[in-house]
């Protein structure tokens, strides 16, 4: 949970409910800049107690009205601390196929990513992207840099034009390919068709990624269960035939 009010309690309660009550494999989400070392130690002990041993360790979004803590400036700092405190935990890190918005260039970004892996990340999940070729190029550059952990592709279906505009405003590093811009323009005043086209575009991305033996798919559903179910129905046969590809 990236809850900006009570990260410690919310994270543990939510992961315990999902893992033990719903019996669904669970990954806890920890934002580095809003945590202290004591908070992390307590969370690790609680997660250990409830049987959750996977963590997505991020820097965390910056909220202008919430003061960050002082112990962890970057995700790498948090990952290193978790590995020192609880080496049996499996840590997932974030990566950015089109470059981190705060990085001066992609070379610097991949160098920092290599540090993240070296201190303890066992796999990575990407920021969302809409051009698979950019992902493949990024993946090749990671291999050249010595990053050999699995990289899961982050996919977000765009269901309406306002969602796309908000995304472009908050994630300025993400580029929309011409094919996707054409969808937004053609169905600007036809919400039902835009939703259908956005879902189809996401499914096409996943089909291509699985065909190219991607390590896994991370679906950004924005808490929309109907969207998740639609994409599951359209793609689950692919995962049955490619059991090595993970989805979460």
Regions found by a protein language model. Name each.
Residues 70-96, 144-204, 235-248:
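Active-site pocket-lining/capping segments in soluble small-molecule metabolic enzymes
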Residues 1-12, 60-70, 121-135, 141, ...:
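Glycine-rich, proline-tolerant flexible connector loops at the mouths of alpha/beta enzymes
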Residues 35-46, 108-112, 137-140, 160-167, ...:
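Catalytic cores of alpha/beta
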Residues 1-107, 214:
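Active-site beta->alpha loop and helix N-cap motifs at the rims of alpha/beta catalytic domains
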């Amino acid at each position: 949970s990236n809850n900006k009010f009570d990260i410690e309690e919310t994270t543990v309660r939510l992961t315990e409910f999902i893992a033990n009550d719903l019996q669904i494999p669970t990954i806890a989400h920890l934002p580095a800049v809003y945590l202290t070392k004591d908070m992390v130690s307590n969370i690790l002990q609680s997660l250990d107690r409830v049987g959750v041993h996977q963590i997505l360790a991020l820097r965390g979004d910056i909220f202008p009205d919430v003061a960050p803590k002082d112990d962890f400036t970057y995700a790498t700092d948090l990952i290193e601390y978790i590995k020192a405190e609880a080496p049996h935990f499996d840590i997932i890190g974030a990566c950015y196929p089109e470059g981190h918005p705060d990085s001066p260039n992609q070379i610097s970004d991949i160098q920092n990513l290599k540090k993240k892996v070296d201190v303890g990340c066992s796999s990575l999940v990407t920021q969302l992207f809409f051009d698979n070729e950019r992902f493949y190029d990024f993946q090749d550059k990671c291999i050249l840099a010595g990053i050999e952990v699995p990289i899961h592709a982050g996919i977000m279906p765009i269901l309406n034009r306002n969602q796309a505009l908000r995304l472009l405003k908050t994630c300025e590093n993400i580029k929309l390919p011409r094919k996707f811009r054409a969808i937004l323009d053609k169905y600007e005043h036809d919400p039902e068709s835009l939703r259908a086209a956005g879902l189809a575009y996401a499914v096409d991305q996943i089909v291509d990624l699985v065909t190219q033996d991607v390590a896994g798919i991370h679906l950004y559903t924005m808490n929309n269960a109907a969207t998740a179910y639609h994409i599951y129905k359209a793609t689950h046969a692919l995962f049955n035939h490619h059991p090595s590809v993970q989805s979460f």
